[in-house]
């Protein structure tokens, strides 16, 4: 995904140069309206490894090149059997098919289609036994295709045959660790995994690492509640170590007992030795999802909450309107009347899930006019709407009077080609 975002960033410059100008930004016919976004329809696919779900995958609307996805790696034992869990949400899954390719995508080693998916609670379960002769310690690309009423959704992971990698132990440890951090009584047992350089009370929640104090690791006095469960995603794994990323959402009550929402991302590097897991590295970033309905105003500006210091923002010449980006959402702020408007967001106001809240996209502000209109570029993975599941670049114009953001141009991205709408 980082490769795609980097490619999108490079193509963004080319795209802007090719489409820049007032005629495009202001006079083109509208092709989309952010208020008309349909709900996400693509299911999620995960791997069930000894009753622990790992490697959550999101659907793409078109086949991607085999070497494009480095989001996850799924280890295989000698049986070469895998169990997949599909969360269909409201979609009907007609069939599950998969394809194994060499890592560069040049050769198809195996492809099969499975129509009998087993219903298990909220999930559909699929058992796969890979029949191809896979070399030990060599990565292969696996493409999964779900046939839906809305079309076909594609999912990607890498598979590798390695012995004694303890993948399920690593995944279970990550799940235990992050859940224990949310429980003060359980968190006391985490001290042996840390290398604290401070022992004071928690004063920061955005840049936590293995050298942070136990109080900081366990969220200090924030008392958060789990809102969206995390699924461990294995990034790298071998016979001695593993790197795992976990993303989840928390809520917390502020001093006025109002609910705040946080996007959390954690990185774990671990070693399995002598029947136990050692934590080699731990990093956590927590970013608050901005909510304009909360008391965010101060005499000299607005409070963005817990986040990093690098803010994408732009103001008009008179400094009467300021546009800023936070957690994949675009906002406008008028200091004169202390008015905040949400300009663009994939997030649903209620009944949302990870499909609409994931931030594998970014926003670049191009211009803020004297009237408060905003031109901006959205690029990356499209969470929902008519372009759900595509990597793309869209130029938007926000009309402040109408409080509507409309897309005036859109381009799909592929690994080595583009297609214009």
What are these language model-derived features?
Residues 391-401:
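Beta-propeller blade signature
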Residues 186-233, 341:
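Short solvent-exposed beta->alpha transition segments
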Residues 32-54, 74-79, 92, 164-174, ...:
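Low-complexity, intrinsically disordered terminal/linker segments enriched in charged
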Residues 305-318, 362-373, 419-421:
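Structural signature of eukaryotic scaffold interfaces centered on beta-propeller domains
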Residues 63-88:
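Contiguous beta-strand segments within globular domains
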Residues 251-252, 329-331, 381-385:
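Short glycine/acidic-enriched loop and turn motifs that connect beta-strands
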């Amino acid at each position: 995904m980082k490769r795609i975002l980097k490619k999108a960033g490079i193509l963004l410059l080319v795209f802007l140069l090719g489409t820049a100008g007032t005629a495009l930004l202001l006079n083109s016919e509208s092709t989309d309206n952010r208020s008309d976004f349909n709900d996400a329809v693509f299911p999620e696919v995960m791997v069930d490894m000894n009753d622990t779900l790992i490697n959550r995958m999101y659907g793409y609307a078109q086949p991607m090149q085999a070497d494009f996805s480095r989001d996850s790696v799924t280890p295989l034992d000698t049986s070469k059997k895998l169990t997949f869990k599909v969360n269909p949400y409201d979609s009907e899954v007609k069939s599950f098919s998969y394809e194994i390719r060499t890592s560069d995508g040049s050769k198809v080693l195996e492809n099969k289609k499975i129509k009998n998916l087993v219903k298990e609670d909220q999930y559909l379960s699929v058992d796969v036994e890979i029949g191809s002769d896979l070399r030990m310690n060599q990565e292969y690309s696996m493409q999964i295709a779900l046939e839906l009423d809305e079309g076909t959704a594609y999912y990607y992971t890498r598979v590798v045959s390695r012995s004694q990698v303890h993948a399920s132990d690593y995944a279970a440890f990550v799940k235990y660790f992050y859940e224990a951090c949310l429980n003060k009584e359980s968190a006391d047992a985490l001290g042996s995994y840390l290398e604290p350089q401070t022992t004071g009370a928690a004063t920061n929640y955005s840049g936590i690492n293995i050298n942070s104090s136990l109080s900081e690791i366990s969220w200090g006095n924030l008392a958060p509640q789990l809102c969206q469960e995390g699924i461990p995603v294995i990034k790298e794994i071998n016979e001695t170590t593993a790197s795992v990323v976990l993303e989840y959402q928390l809520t917390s009550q502020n001093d006025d007992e109002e609910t705040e929402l946080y996007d959390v991302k954690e990185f774990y590097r671990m070693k399995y030795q002598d029947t136990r897991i050692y934590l080699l590295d731990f990093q956590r970033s927590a970013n608050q999802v901005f909510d304009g309905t909360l008391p965010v105003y101060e005499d000299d500006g607005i409070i963005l909450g817990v986040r990093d210091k690098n803010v994408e923002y732009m103001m008009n010449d008179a400094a009467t309107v300021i546009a800023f980006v936070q957690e994949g959402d675009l906002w406008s702020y008028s200091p004169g009347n202390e008015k905040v408007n949400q300009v663009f967001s994939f997030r649903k106001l209620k009944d949302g899930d990870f499909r609409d809240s994931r931030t594998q996209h970014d926003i670049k502000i191009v211009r803020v006019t004297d009237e408060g209109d905003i031109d901006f570029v959205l690029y990356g993975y499209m969470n929902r709407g008519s372009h759900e599941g595509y990597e793309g670049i869209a130029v938007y114009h926000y009309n402040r009077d109408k409080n509507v953001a409309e897309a005036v141009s859109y381009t799909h991205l592929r690994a080595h080609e583009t297609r214009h709408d």
